[in-house]
A protein has these predicted regions:
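FMN-binding flavodoxin-like domain, especially the glycine-rich phosphate-binding loop
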Residues: 3, 9, 13-28, 33, ...
Length: 142
């Protein structure tokens, strides 16, 4: 099974989550600012932060080019200082493209003094468990 991890980050929080997922799956995460290639895969882990209730422009742009025939399944991971995860609608945008969502993960991110030290060790452990669970579920159903 071919797995890719794509993320966009302004603060570095999503990179921490992507690196943890990559560690579990043995996959090198790709930062959209450095590599926005559209690679075919069986399962895409895609993540970003929520900034004023919206996704980053890089992530929005990347989604536009995804094709469900080349990327049939995705798992979403996000961080946010507020509860704006649902406002971003990352999973909804992927579903609109015809991509099956096989998992969603969100945790706190920090901004200035709000929710300092997030993502923390507990968040990292949780995203690792999420990644392992999603990969196991997808492998079992293939």
């Amino acid at each position: 099974m071919k797995v890719n991890i794509i993320y966009s980050t302004l603060s570095g929080h999503t990179k921490k989550l992507a690196d943890a997922i990559g560690e579990v799956l043995g996959v090198e995460p790709q930062n959209l600012k450095e590599d926005n290639g559209y690679y075919d895969c069986d399962l895409l882990f895609i993540g970003g932060g929520i900034y004023s209730g919206a996704l980053s422009p890089e992530l929005d742009g990347y989604i536009e080019f995804l094709n469900p025939q080349n990327t049939p399944k995705a798992a979403v991971f996000m961080s946010s200082v507020s509860e704006d995860y649902q406002k971003s609608n990352l999973a909804g945008k992927l579903r609109e493209k015809g991509i099956e969502i096989v998992g969603e993960f969100s945790c706190n991110g920090s901004f200035l003094v709000m929710k300092m030290f997030h993502p923390n060790k507990k968040d990292i452990a949780s995203v690792k468990e999420f990644a392992a669970d999603v990969a196991t579920k997808v492998l079992k159903n293939n």
